């Protein structure tokens, strides 16, 4: 499916660069506190969904030795990787450009004897150089899952179903899965007799859906008009089941092409039987931009985001580059793009509200004690000592709550007859999650009653 280059992300609460004198390198992100909470919550929700499917989280190093990881990465990706020299050994280090290759290296070299199939999940930051004019980020926040040691039909369906269910779990209401098989398009290129370099360039053009560039490559390679037209036609074959019959016409009975279509048809039919037919589009030109994919591949798109939210596919020979041939499949989601997609639908994702505890500086000890008591209940508490006293204290506390945009404020020491009692100030949160100038409600109650009400609210929410 065609996708337009995105603009630089700012919707995740990122600080906007001023100009060429920006303090943050181009393509890197500073995510501000409110958005950071949402992003971390989103990552946690995804990993929880993966865990329920039996996927265990793995934490991988940010740096890898160049010579160790290089077998799993194509030359173009290595060229666009950030490299530094290890001061201790003098060896070249890579700043992580791809997680799947890291997992392949880990499984092949560090998890010998592990029972297969193996289900792994991760959250990681990936770094890749992109030219300024492309508009892509150079720092990518990813959450992903890998199913290692299974090559049957159910494995392909499981990993796609996991991606679908996780997107639904986090609240993305509308999206499409573009489903293909790299063996079909590669087979057409092989049949056309392209040189090794020409095939590589054609694959890159296909992954970008760049028709003019692909046509130029085919002309330069002197591919016959009929073969060239078949390749260009395949890149446009996108739709439902009818796409498969058109693909079989292009295959002309050649076994590698037919086998790729057969596997694609089986995966598509099984997913449709599970009720996912409305989410799926068959794309015979689907071609992910990594050379280790060799089977079923897929991308996910949503309205309003001009680039895929994520994707993945089968890589049966990648781990073999590190010494052990193990069939595998997996996917990664771009957390920032997914966050943007969710923001287009709902800007008020749930985050646990805080309570502001305000008291005079003369009651600092009691202030700390009450704050600790509330935290033990599981509440996020911000404490603040002020110089005001008496009724001025309530006004100062109300102003502090408004300034901090916190809906509930507890005021200690406001001339109550019983020091066990506090004044509770509350404002209604508006539709955007802010309190704004909504009406202020005041209530006097004991700390034990307030704590009990918090427990009841939290139990009801769960």
Q: What do the PLM-derived regions correspond to, one by one?
A:
Residues 2, 35, 41-53, 64-65, ...:
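Positively charged, Gly/Ser-enriched RNA/tRNA-binding surfaces
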Residues 137-143, 179-187:
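Short, conserved phosphate-binding/catalytic loop or strand-edge motifs used
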């Amino acid at each position: 499916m065609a996708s337009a280059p995105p603009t630089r992300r700012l919707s995740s609460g990122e600080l906007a660069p001023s100009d060429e004198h920006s303090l943050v390198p181009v393509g890197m992100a500073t995510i501000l506190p409110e958005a950071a909470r949402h992003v971390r919550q989103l990552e946690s929700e995804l990993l929880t969904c993966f865990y329920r499917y039996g996927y265990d989280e793995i934490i991988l190093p940010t740096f890898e030795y160049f010579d160790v990881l290089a077998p799993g990465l194509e030359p173009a990706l290595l060229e666009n990787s950030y490299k530094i020299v290890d001061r201790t050994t003098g060896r070249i280090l890579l700043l992580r450009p791809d997680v799947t290759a890291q997992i392949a290296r880990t499984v092949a070299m560090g998890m010998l004897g592990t029972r297969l199939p193996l289900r792994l999940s991760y959250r990681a930051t990936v770094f890749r150089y992109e030219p300024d004019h492309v508009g892509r980020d150079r720092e990518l926040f990813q959450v992903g899952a890998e199913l290692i040691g299974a090559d049957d039909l159910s494995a392909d369906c499981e990993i796609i179903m996991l991606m679908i269910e996780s997107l639904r779990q986090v609240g993305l209401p509308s999206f499409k899965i573009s489903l293909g098989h790299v063996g079909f398009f590669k087979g057409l290129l092989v049949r056309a007799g392209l040189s090794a370099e020409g095939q590589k360039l054609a694959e890159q053009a296909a992954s970008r859906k760049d028709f003019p560039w692909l046509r130029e490559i085919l002309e330069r390679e002197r591919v016959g008009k009929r073969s060239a037209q078949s390749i260009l036609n395949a890149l446009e074959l996108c739709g439902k089941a009818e796409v498969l019959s058109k693909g079989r016409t292009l295959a002309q009975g050649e076994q590698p092409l037919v086998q790729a279509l057969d596997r694609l048809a089986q995966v598509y039919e099984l997913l449709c039987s599970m009720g996912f037919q409305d989410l799926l589009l068959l794309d015979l030109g689907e071609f992910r931009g990594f050379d280790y994919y060799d089977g079923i591949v897929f991308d996910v798109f949503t309205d309003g985001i001009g680039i895929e939210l994520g994707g993945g596919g089968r890589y049966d020979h990648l781990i073999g580059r590190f010494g052990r041939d193990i069939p595998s499949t997996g996917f990664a989601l771009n957390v920032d793009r997914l966050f943007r997609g969710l923001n287009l639908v709902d800007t008020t994702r749930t985050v646990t509200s805080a309570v502001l505890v305000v008291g005079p500086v003369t009651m600092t000890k009691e202030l700390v004690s009450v704050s600790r008591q509330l935290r033990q209940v599981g509440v996020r508490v911000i404490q603040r000592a002020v110089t005001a006293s008496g009724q001025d204290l309530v006004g100062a506390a109300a102003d502090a709550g408004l300034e901090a945009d916190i809906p509930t404020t507890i005021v200690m020491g406001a001339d109550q007859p019983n020091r066990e009692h506090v004044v509770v100030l509350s404002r209604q949160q508006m539709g955007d999650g802010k309190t704004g100038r909504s009406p202020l409600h005041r209530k006097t109650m004991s700390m034990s009653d307030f704590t009990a009400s918090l427990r009841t609210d939290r139990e009801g929410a769960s």
